[in-house]
Amino acid sequence: MIMAGGTGGHVFPGLAVARAMQAEGWRVIWLGTRNGMEATLVPQHGFTIELINFSGLRGKKPVSYLLLPWRLAKACWQSFCILRRQRPQIVLGMGGYPALPGGIMAVLSGKPLLIHEQNRIAGLTNKILAKIASRILLAFPGTITDQAGKIQVTGNPVRTEIAQLPSPEVRYAKRAGKLNILVVGGSLGAQALNTVLPQALSMIPGNQRPFVTHQSGKVHLAALQQAYAEHGVTGNLVAFIEDMAVYYQNCDLVVCRAGALTIAELAAAGVASILVPYPYAVDDHQTANARFLSEHHAAVLWPQSELTANSLAQWLMTCTRTQLQTMAINARMLAMPEAAQSVVTVCQQLIETGP
């Protein structure tokens, strides 16, 4: 049984593991919530999902905290009933609030519990479950340190087509002329990037100006098109990118946020990046994620508060493809492309040996 929900940062890694399990003949059941994206996304990928009633607390009104004991007890009972009905051999928590009651009841039911933490700073659910889990799987070394005997670093599961891209040495060596930049703000876009990029491009002489593909998010596409037009620059402006592997393969540089999956994909693809962490992320975990690449000279960490059109334009005009290739090679050296299979292997070992 896989438990994950709330955001794509938990659900998509869970789906990657689910597919790896399914490929080995496993029956996979998902535990999620009715209001999370997993309720529709998981069935679309062909997996059975069981739903409980539970939600996160961060940012909620004080009354939500008063109701927490009742809501948690109810969710635990629902999880217990599902566990008794489905009888999984092992339970894997991938983070997000549905994993909390499910993880608690898995342990109380005598089921082996593994948790996987995608970010460099652990989320609240995994901080709690780490104390009772049989195994703790991490995307980044050092995220959890007080359970040393139970920890294994597996990396974050990424899509196979990204992990199988040619090496940076092969890709970058064939290129000449203007840089090719990919700007990604996530499925909802990043307004700070949408504002700064067209203005920065307008400050670069036409004969030096990079080719740009800019994913804006559906809501912001019209405004982005207007901004590019007002600044007299052009680009391939899209609301959403389905096949990221193709764009990673063809670009010299990615400008993006620093979600855990983005970091894993940049490393797996082997591509240089400017990382602009979302400044309001819980516990500022995106900055911690970004440092994993920047500390290894595989990316530039650029706080949003310091990102201006002028500074970005100056950086792009002085940057060379050779420098970007070096960053891309460094990124690829940090990749863990077998992460999904590693998670499955640990699950299999735990089934065979017990908690």
From Swiss-Prot:
It is a peripheral membrane protein. One of its GO terms (biological process) is peptidoglycan biosynthetic process. This is UDP-N-acetylglucosamine--N-acetylmuramyl-(pentapeptide) pyrophosphoryl-undecaprenol N-acetylglucosamine transferase. CDD domains: GT28_MurG. It is found in: Cell inner membrane. HAMAP family: MurG. Belongs to the glycosyltransferase 28 family. MurG subfamily. InterPro entries: GlcNAc_MurG (IPR006009), Glyco_trans_28_C (IPR007235), GlycoTrans_28_N (IPR004276). Cell wall formation. Catalyzes the transfer of a GlcNAc subunit on undecaprenyl-pyrophosphoryl-MurNAc-pentapeptide (lipid intermediate I) to form undecaprenyl-pyrophosphoryl-MurNAc-(pentapeptide)GlcNAc (lipid intermediate II). One of its GO terms (cellular component) is plasma membrane. Keywords: Cell cycle, Cell division, Cell inner membrane, Cell membrane, Cell shape, Cell wall biogenesis/degradation, Glycosyltransferase, Membrane, Peptidoglycan synthesis, Transferase. Its EC number is 2.4.1.227. Its main location: membrane. It holds the Pfam family Glyco_transf_28. It catalyses: di-trans,octa-cis-undecaprenyl diphospho-N-acetyl-alpha-D-muramoyl-L-alanyl-D-glutamyl-meso-2,6-diaminopimeloyl-D-alanyl-D-alanine + UDP-N-acetyl-alpha-D-glucosamine = di-trans,octa-cis-undecaprenyl diphospho-[N-acetyl-alpha-D-glucosaminyl-(1->4)]-N-acetyl-alpha-D-muramoyl-L-alanyl-D-glutamyl-meso-2,6-diaminopimeloyl-D-alanyl-D-alanine + UDP + H(+). One of its GO terms (molecular function) is undecaprenyldiphospho-muramoylpentapeptide beta-N-acetylglucosaminyltransferase activity. UDP-N-acetyl-alpha-D-glucosamine binds at residues 7-9, 119, 159, 187, 241, 286. Pathway: Cell wall biogenesis; peptidoglycan biosynthesis. The keyword Nucleotide-binding does not apply. Transmembrane segments: none annotated.
